[in-house]
Amino acid sequence: MVKEISVGNIKIGGDRPLVLVAGPCVIENEAATLRCAERLMTICNGVSMPLIFKASYDKANRTSVNSFRGPGLKDGLKILKKVKESLGVPVLSDIHSIEQVEPAAEVLDVIQIPAFLCRQTDLVVAAAMSGRVINIKKGQFLAPWDMENVVGKAVSTGNDNVILTERGVSFGYNNLVSDMRSFPILRQTGYPVIFDATHSVQLPGGLGGSSGGQREFVEYLGRAAVATGIDGIFMEVHEDPEKALCDGPNSVKLDDLPALLKKLKAIDAIVK
């Protein structure tokens, strides 16, 4: 049985219904972030789906040094705190160094370990020692069964509030594929599993100076993943993906989200 974990007033795992983790790839500015969060709350209330709001304060692994990275730790956490307090929604963001754990834990309900950093023992342990829920994204270079050892690092601290996220595996150059077998294997760890449906259609570095993406496949992969009985779906969204400052090619347009969530919710109800 998969552990049930509390994130604010939301329950994920066990036999609970699907949870949405969504927001812009990066905090572009305060107004846009609040606007996106408010829209997501309205959409999720309309389809009765729990929401965890996500946004990055720093995109530390952008393809180019010239790419927009976000407002940084201090200003970014201020914006996420405002989202959390004004809307009453749990918030998630990713950390990149041990020094970020303490200030992040003061605001975030969920601390995320980026896929590229999931093997960094000291970072995983420090994040888990904060006592917050930890979402560990599976590296594009790892097999699903490799995550058993990563989970072991986190729970060695006594914090077993761990979530795992699948975001695809490298397939040749500038491409990712999603192996549906990964989900039941990851759930065998005993912890909730989320599918990152938008990063999984990313084409890393595919545009030369930035990553490309194939958002037209988000729905298909999302439907397939939900059919395996996963616990949550992760999607980066934007009011106008073509103008997004990060990961626009694989972000879902907010206008398209309600119809997609209804389909995913229907599949989730059948398999649980």
From Swiss-Prot:
Gene3D superfamilies for this protein: Aldolase class I
Reactions accelerated catalytically: D-arabinose 5-phosphate + phosphoenolpyruvate + H2O = 3-deoxy-alpha-D-manno-2-octulosonate-8-phosphate + phosphate
Subcellular locations according to the entry: Cytoplasm
Keywords assigned: Cytoplasm, Lipopolysaccharide biosynthesis, Transferase
GO molecular function: 3-deoxy-8-phosphooctulonate synthase activity
CC terms in the record's Gene Ontology section: cytoplasm
Uppermost EC category: transferase
GO terms of biological process kind: keto-3-deoxy-D-manno-octulosonic acid biosynthetic process
Keyword Cytoplasm in annotation: yes
UniProt EC number: 2.5.1.55
Pathway noted in the entry: Carbohydrate biosynthesis; 3-deoxy-D-manno-octulosonate biosynthesis; 3-deoxy-D-manno-octulosonate from D-ribulose 5-phosphate: step 2/3; Bacterial outer membrane biogenesis; lipopolysaccharide biosynthesis
Disulfide linkage: none
Origin superkingdom: Bacteria
A Pfam short name: DAHP_synth_1
HAMAP family according to UniProt: KDO8P_synth
UniProt record similarity statement: Belongs to the KdsA family.
Protein name per its UniProtKB record: 2-dehydro-3-deoxyphosphooctonate aldolase
Lineage: Bacteria, Pseudomonadati, Thermodesulfobacteriota, Desulfuromonadia, Geobacterales
